[in-house]
Regions:
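Short beta-strand segments enriched in small/hydrophobic residues
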Residues: 12, 17-22, 56-72, 82, ...
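Flexible loop/turn connectors
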Residues: 235-348
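Alpha-helical recognition/docking segments in bacterial nutrient-uptake
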Residues: 1-5, 59-173, 241-244
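N-terminal helix-turn-helix DNA-binding module of bacterial transcription factors
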Residues: 1-62, 75, 338, 348-349
Length: 349
């Protein structure tokens, strides 16, 4: 059985391929007679347009690449689902790349450049730490439009992100309103991303507004992972603060917060009775029983939809001016924060 192409249908109907495409998508701009003729021929031939054919008519691919750090991380997996859903609504397919851990990303080095040159994407959405030098270089060298999703890069590309300074400020402000006077910041790695740095600066500024300072030794460095959060928690509770922990803790990432929460639970430290813990971002796991973490976040659906719309505006309208969209985060209060009650921690011996 012969497989007809969109060009075959256009030739048989004596119209252009673009007209056939408009009929297929039920778009305006085709008179009734021509529309009826095209539909008749499509029905007689049994023609079904492939995604490649639709792409050729549009003059570009209808596939968007989505690069995230690690799909095992709840944040990135939730982001991927939301972005894919929005792209599908707009008529685009998604190819997702999970780069892996920090070490794996460093080993792959120029993965963004390789992906953008290997595949004929209409555009790329990228959500990896902005301290990733090779990602930044890949954005500069990309063959297609790029939008950075909730990560702030010092490169000329469209960027959609939450206001990270405001996120950190809101976290510190809320802990102080609850009455906390001693604070601990799980800050992230020394080569932290721009996003992490802005959140840290916002948190410190919220203390300064009220005449407080964060002790330098209370800004704890570590990777933004559950393992790192757990290891830091164990070390802090057993070595650094064996008798009492600062009562207000801000974790600069939800994975490190989950690890810290586990360490506290294993050592009898009650959340929020002994320590209030607040973090950033809001994947579904944050609201699960036994976790129930207060957080500062922009709704994931809003952020992903905004990023997709910005990318497709550049693809479809050929917009040249770069855009930076800063979304304002909101406080989500759950069961991990409360006014301070006491500072003494249980005897773990």
């Amino acid at each position: 059985m012969r497989r007809y192409t969109i060009s075959d249908i256009a030739r048989m109907a004596d119209v252009s391929p673009a007209t056939v495409s408009r009929v297929l998508s039920n778009s305006p701009g085709v008179n009734k007679v021509k529309r009826a003729e095209v539909k008749r021929i499509i029905e007689e031939t049994g023609y079904h347009p492939s995604s490649a054919a639709r792409s050729l008519v549009r003059g570009c691919s209808n596939v968007v690449g989505l690069i995230v750090r690690d799909l095992e991380n709840q944040y990135y997996s939730a982001m991927a689902v939301c972005a894919q859903r929005r792209l599908l609504e707009r008529g685009y397919m998604t190819m997702i790349f999970s780069i892996g851990t920090k070490a794996e990303a460093e080993e792959k080095r120029d993965y963004v450049t390789e992906i953008s040159h290997k595949f004929d994407f209409a555009g790329l959405l990228i959500s990896v730490p902005s301290c990733d030098y090779f990602a930044a270089e890949g954005i500069r060298n990309s063959r297609c439009p790029v939008v950075s999703l909730n990560r702030t890069f010092d490169v000329a590309c469209d960027q959609v992100a939450q206001n990270d300074f405001q996120a950190g400020f809101l976290a510190g402000e809320y802990l102080q309103k609850l009455g906390h006077e001693s604070f601990l910041l799980l800050a992230g790695p020394a080569d932290e991303s721009v996003s992490c740095r802005f959140r840290m600066e916002g948190f410190i500024q919220s203390l300064a507004v009220n005449g407080r300072e964060l002790d330098e030794e209370n800004a704890i460095r570590g990777e933004l992972s559950m393992d790192s959060g757990y290891e830091l928690g164990v070390k802090l509770l057993e070595e650094r603060f064996p008798d009492h922990l600062p009562t207000g803790v801000f974790a600069n990432g939800n994975s490190i917060a989950l690890g810290f929460l586990k360490a506290c639970g294993e050592r009898g430290v009650r959340i929020p009775q002994d320590v209030s813990l607040i973090t950033v971002d809001n994947p579904a796991i944050m609201d699960m029983p036994g976790i129930n973490l207060s957080t500062i976040s922009v709704p994931m659906e809003q952020m992903a939809s905004e990023a997709v719309d910005v990318l497709l505006e550049r693809i479809e309208r050929k917009r040249e001016k770069k855009r930076f969209v800063a979304l304002q985060p909101e406080l989500i209060v759950r069961g991990s924060t409360a006014p301070p009650q006491r500072r003494c921690l249980p005897d773990n011996k």
